[in-house]
Amino acid sequence: MAIVHFVNYKRGTQSHAAMRGVMLYVMQEKKTAWEGKPLVSGINCQPQSAYDDFLNTKLLYHKDGGVMFYHMVQSFPKGAAVDPRQAHEAARRLAEYFGGCDVLVCTHVDREHIHSHCVINSVNFETGKKLHMAKEQIQELMRRNDAICQEMGLPVFEVTAQQARGMSGAEYHTALKGQSWKLRLMNTIDECMKDAADRDAFVCILYLTTCAPLCIR
C-alpha cells in the first residue's frame, strides 16, 4: 500500500510566498505530465486559482497567519506496478478526508516512485475553523489510506524501519557518496531558484526538495 507522510516545515517558514512557491513546485508540468496531460486537480478549488482560493478563505475568516497549509505526500514504492492515473485518483480520494478545505492534488511521475502531493488549506471554508492534525486524525487518515488502496487493488509492500522513521536532512546528505554530491547540490539549488519567487519560497522549496519528510504509516 502507499505510504502517507507530511512535509514537516520548520516554524516560521510558512508565508504567502512560501505557499505560492510550494504550489508552483508541485504543479510543474515536467513532473506531472502523463500521456500529454498533467495529473493535477483540485478538491473544492481550481488548480489554476488554488493560491487565490486559499488566500480568499483565510482573509474571509481573518486567519491569515501561523500555519498556512499542510503538505501531505502519498508515495508508492520504487518499481510498483501502479498506473499514474490510479495513483492520482487514490490521492484525490484521500484528500476528500479534509472536507471543507481546499486541496491541490498533483501526482509526480518523474521519479522511479510515483507519488502525489496534496497541499491543504489550513482554514476550512465552510466553518472558518483552522485544521489541526492531532494523533486521532492522523490514525484515521492512515486507516482511510489503507482502505482506499485495498478498494482500488493497489499493490501492498513492506515498510522498512528506515522508511517508517524517515531521514533527517543531515542523514540524507551523508548518504550521498563520492564527489557527485557537490554537483547534485548545485543543480538542486539552481532548480529551486528557478521555481522560487523570493527568499521564503526558495527556503521552502529547497527544504522540500532535499530533506526527507516525517513519515507516517
Language model regions located:
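N-terminal nicking endonuclease/strand-transfer module with a His-rich metal-binding environment
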Residues: 1-217
